[in-house]
């Protein structure tokens, strides 16, 4: 059978932005990792990811402190959620303060990180509810095996221009990986973030529902209840 995954090669994001018309921005994300975040004698666990700076603008994170444009420009920087900042710093402005990240997840990077931003907590219905983000390049430097085209361990996020056609871009992507990897049989394609939660299930490479089935079930129940009420 055919398996479908969000794991892609590390170099893909930059290549797509440079080579595929209609893609105006791109960024890389690691998989979610849980770390022990330490400030003095205070330590809390928090799930986060390593991300390119462009992710901050594409995800439209709302910053309370710091600037989304530059918050992840430095190697040992970290942006944290409002709730994490509250637990560690109370009502104080944490910008410029140093946190220790104690690596508990495989391939994560421990050490001292400077707080460069605080963002509003993400809604409960987000696919990712990360509590911290640090630069992808920091993760990549510590794990150089991420760099080759034949390692699929990075999530690639792209932003299209308003006039771009996803269908047209997907046609260009059909055999794109074979131009980068000799003998590659894998294919990549765009999948809208709007569909991640409700239509994120694939069978043999073809979309096959997801949580949308529960929406349909609830809709059917609602219709039945309404029909019964009308009798």
Predicted ranges, named:
Residues 6, 49, 78, 216-219:
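Residues that recognize and position ribonucleotide moieties
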Residues 6-65, 187, 191:
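Short amphipathic beta-strand/extended segments in non-transmembrane regions
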Residues 14, 34-35, 97, 156, ...:
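Residue-level detector of beta-strand structural context in well-folded domains
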Residues 37-40, 75-80:
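Short secondary-structure transition/capping segments
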Residues 52-65, 77-210:
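Mid-to-C-terminal secondary-structure elements
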Residues 69-73:
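Glycine-rich loop motifs involved in handling phospho/adenylate chemistry
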Residues 210-231:
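Hydrophobic alpha-helical transmembrane segments of multi-pass inner-membrane transport and secretion
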